Amino acid sequence: MITPPDVFKSLSDETRARATLLIASLGELCVCELMCALNDSQPKISRHLAQLRSNGMLLDRRQGQWVYYRLNPELPSWVHEMLQVTLQANSQWLADNALRLKNMDGRPVRDSVCC
């Protein structure tokens, strides 16, 4: 079971916090979408996602050569609630990331090829 210190430690890095909130907002994102939204390299994004996955915050699924990430549905309800409150109270903090993602060329359609 994930504890409050585990959650807050996971979200203490800005890249992990932004990625987690974007995933919480949109349901599921692949590495290439997060690269675009966060304007970061694939190795950096993948490293942070691996950390979030290893501590139980995220689950992944492979579709061909692409990996998609989503919140772990077995997280305690307080984690989901905290993420939703954070999203609602801080939409401006993620506005640039959301805009980059919205304007992404070749954005993947689920169940098809990414990027």
Swiss-Prot record:
Residue ranges annotated for the HTH arsR-type domain, each copy included: 1-90
Entry-linked SUPFAM superfamilies: Winged helix' DNA-binding domain (SSF46785)
Matching PROSITE patterns: HTH_ARSR_2 (PS50987)
Disulphide-bridged cysteine pairs: none
UniProt keywords, alphabetically: Arsenical resistance, Cytoplasm, DNA-binding, Metal-binding, Metal-thiolate cluster, Transcription, Transcription regulation
Matching InterPro entries: ArsR-like_HTH, HTH_ArsR_DNA-bd_dom, HTH_MetalResp_TranReg, WH-like_DNA-bd_sf, WH_DNA-bd_sf
Cellular localisation: Cytoplasm
Cytoplasm among keywords: yes
Residues annotated as binding arsenite: C30, C32
Cellular component terms (Gene Ontology): cytoplasm
MF GO annotations: DNA binding; DNA-binding transcription factor activity; metal ion binding
One GO process term, biological-process aspect: response to arsenic-containing substance
Keyword Transcription among record annotations: yes
DNA-binding residues: 31-54
Superkingdom of this protein's organism: Bacteria
Applications: Could be used to construct robust and highly sensitive arsenic biosensors.
Described purpose of this protein according to its UniProt entry: Binds arsenite and regulates the expression of arsenic efflux pumps. In vitro, also binds antimony and bismuth, but not arsenate.
Subunit composition and interactions: Homodimer.
Name recorded for this polypeptide: Arsenic resistance transcriptional regulator ArsR2
